[in-house]
Amino acid sequence: MKGGQQAPSALRVVVADDHHHVLPEIHAAIRRRLVPFQGVHVLHFDAHPDLSFPRSVDPALVFEPHALYDALDESVSGIAEFLLPLVYAGHVNQLMWIKPQWATQRLCVSLPLLHFIEEDAYAAVDAMASETIKPWDFFITELPDRLPSVSTHAPSSAIVDGHDVLAQLQRKPAQAYILDIDLDYFSTWNPFRKDLEQRVGAATANIVAQVFTALRYRDMGNGMSIAARSQDRRSFVAALGQLEDQKATQANDPSVFDPSSLVYQSILNTLTPLYRDGVDAPDLLTKFMNLMGTLDHDARQLVWWAGPNLDLPHHMSSNDEIERMVAALRDFLVDIATTNGKSAHPPSLVTIAKSTGDEYLPPHQLEFVQSRVLRCLRDVFGDLDVEFVAYEDVQDAEDNANEE
């Protein structure tokens, strides 16, 4: 529903639930010349980097928007896969991820950060097709610490104010910038951990988390080469896949978890050297194998689904924390909207993801967070043209049509 008749100068704000559903609105803004075709910077406030791309999708779909939208809807992680298509298409040449202080996940592309290795998206420059390379600037930072009750602290490289961001934005010429806000920036659930703990308990979830996160390739300070990290990751995925397949085909046969079985020993021998120094891998893996042997099919499937995501941030903010973060956002936006006492351009477009459908934002906090963010935007930029975009699942739409 579109909010009323607005002055021509009103700032357009698009609000969707799933984050990737802002992509059609960005493309529409480009077509309407509200956003330039290229040279766009994105300020991305989010508890997650959202820099994935589905490996099964042909990159050519980046230039076929409707097919791309369908692919993202079908992808299990489509909400994290809407930004890189904008880079690959040449629209965005700089992205700044501004994260909350509890988002400690480490972030290819030719950038050998853990996020890209995990997503199997890293490639050395000389392994890329030269005509497809799209150079872009990427920054990660935080707003000043305004949450006294949060135990983590901003690193020394954290932003002091919006002028620091402006200096970074000016490193590369920009035609305009998009302000992109995921409301889970202000309060974050990890739905994977929450669902797993509810099903199998916190102690079991902790064992699963160690199996998936205590791996040496995830330690970016141990001197491993990128090739070795990538190989370790592939070995880990293959071994866990073997275990999953064995249990799927022998659902009622516990022998796959018998320490004397060849399958068990093969998987154990493959996985043990993949763990960090100081981790008792045989003991950890034995606990995990024993655990998996006691779970029913649905619980095992939950482990495979949740395991790779148990290190995602999880911090439900109090109302006071949220108010402080919104105040920090307001200060930040005022800083970048004013340069040397002169008014600077507002964003060409604001996109907001509610993220309550998948519960990355605790659903009961939506109204509180959303109302304060919109009020913040009005305080800084004046009139807003707010549109709430709703998307219906294709199958649901067909079912409803058949009922009619």
Predicted regions and their residues:
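Conserved alpha-helical scaffold segments that buttress catalytic/binding sites
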Residues: 1-404
